[in-house]
Regions:
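Ankyrin repeat domain, specifically the short helix-to-loop turn at the C-terminus of the second helix
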Residues: 16-25, 46-55, 76-83
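Ankyrin-repeat-protein effector appendages
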Residues: 71-107
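Small side chains
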Residues: 3, 16, 44-46, 65
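Ankyrin-repeat boundary/"N-cap" motif
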Residues: 1-5, 26-35, 55-66, 87-93
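Conserved ankyrin/ankyrin-like repeat signature
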Residues: 13-14, 43-44, 72-73
Length: 107
């Protein structure tokens, strides 16, 4: 979907157009936050939170940013009040991500 690609590649102008002019669904906006955090696109993340008013309600967004080593996104999410995963939740997230990519624990 175009909105996910825009968020993942940091194409903020396209993302703005899709949200403001094409009126994409709320669920797609949530997925765009996940995509922006996964790929470390802080400008897109800020737009989604500050202008598109996507509420930061999912701890998985912090987990995506942390797992993919985007500390600027982690810090931003936490500063804005996004819930942080517990150690147990994060361990489960890591296990799930590794299983998707075929990695084993300890690799």
């Amino acid at each position: 979907d175009a909105a996910h690609q825009a968020a993942g590649y940091g194409r903020i102008n396209i993302l703005k157009y899709l949200i403001e002019e094409r009126k994409i669904f709320y669920a797609v906006k949530l997925d765009c936050v996940a995509t922006a955090t996964r790929f470390g696109k802080l400008d897109c993340l800020k737009y989604l939170v500050e202008e598109a008013k996507v509420p930061l309600t999912h701890m998985v967004w912090v987990a995506y940013a942390r797992y993919n080593e985007h500390p600027d996104c982690v810090n931003y999410l936490l500063e804005k009040g996004c819930p942080e995963p517990t150690d147990e939740q994060y361990a489960g997230f890591v296990e799930y991500e590794r299983s998707k990519s075929g990695q084993q624990s300890g690799d």
